[in-house]
């Protein structure tokens, strides 16, 4: 357990120390750093459903376990995400929103932590298209690794997009605070942001594909859907999966 106090703004170190001592010293004593425990996931894959009868939309989350934030594949994983679902023109959003019209938006992201992270893709879709949407997600996952391997143009566009976004990380007081928090929380090198664009630029297709082969494994997939179970289960677009109803565990009726 470790506590960080990150302050940005028109102030001084002396002022921060004065008020932080008053606010926290009596409540919190200095403690040694304790590393995050090694967490063992349930047996994978996992397919869960929460039943909301009458829901006009289904919320879909599809996830994969991944490595810690400081893993050497971080930059390749970041570029992979940008291609797969990290931007408006990404593959998954283009498929489900623009081509199929199932959703207003479908995206992907990493939730990073010290030892174990999770890669997720998700959004809300019309209830009647729940299983069809899952089929398209499965298709995009498999094609990324086989018949539609990213080519140079797609790779370069993804990297350019990430680099173009970079200045926005410094545009406000709160965004600078987020940067400092990120460095502290993940124990990053102090020059991490100075080298970020260069490290993104160096990512190769081979590195992205190595991440894809390790990350996008159907055998380790985790799916959670929240919607009208009756409509979803009566859908003719079937995948070879059986959902576990966890409604009672999370919804009080």
Protein language model features and the residues they cover:
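Charge-rich, well-structured scaffold segments of protease-associated domains
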Residues: 1-32, 99-100, 104-253
């Amino acid at each position: 357990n470790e506590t960080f106090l990150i302050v940005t703004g028109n102030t001084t170190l002396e002022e921060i120390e004065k008020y932080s001592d008053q606010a926290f010293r009596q409540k919190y004593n200095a403690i040694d750093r304790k590393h995050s425990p090694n967490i063992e996931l349930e047996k994978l894959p996992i397919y869960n459903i929460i039943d909301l009868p009458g829901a006009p939309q289904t919320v879909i989350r599809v996830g994969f376990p991944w490595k810690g934030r400081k893993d050497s594949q971080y930059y390749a994983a970041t570029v992979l995400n940008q291609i797969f679902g990290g931007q408006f023109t990404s593959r998954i959003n283009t498929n489900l929103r623009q081509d199929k019209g199932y959703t207003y938006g479908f995206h992907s992201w990493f939730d990073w932590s010290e030892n174990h992270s999770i890669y997720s893709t998700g959004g809300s879709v019309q209830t009647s298209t729940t299983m069809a949407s899952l089929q398209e997600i499965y298709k995009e996952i498999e094609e990324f690794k086989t018949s539609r391997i990213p080519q140079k143009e797609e790779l370069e566009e993804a990297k350019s997009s990430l680099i173009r976004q970079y200045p926005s990380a410094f545009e406000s007081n709160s965004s600078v605070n987020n940067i400092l928090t990120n460095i502290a929380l993940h124990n990053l090198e102090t020059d991490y942001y100075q080298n970020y664009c260069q490290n993104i630029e160096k990512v190769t297709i081979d590195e992205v594909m190595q991440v894809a082969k390790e990350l996008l494994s159907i055998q380790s997939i985790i799916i959670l859907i929240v919607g009208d179970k009756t409509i979803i289960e009566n859908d003719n677009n079937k995948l070879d999966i059986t959902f576990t109803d966890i409604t009672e565990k999370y919804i009080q009726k």
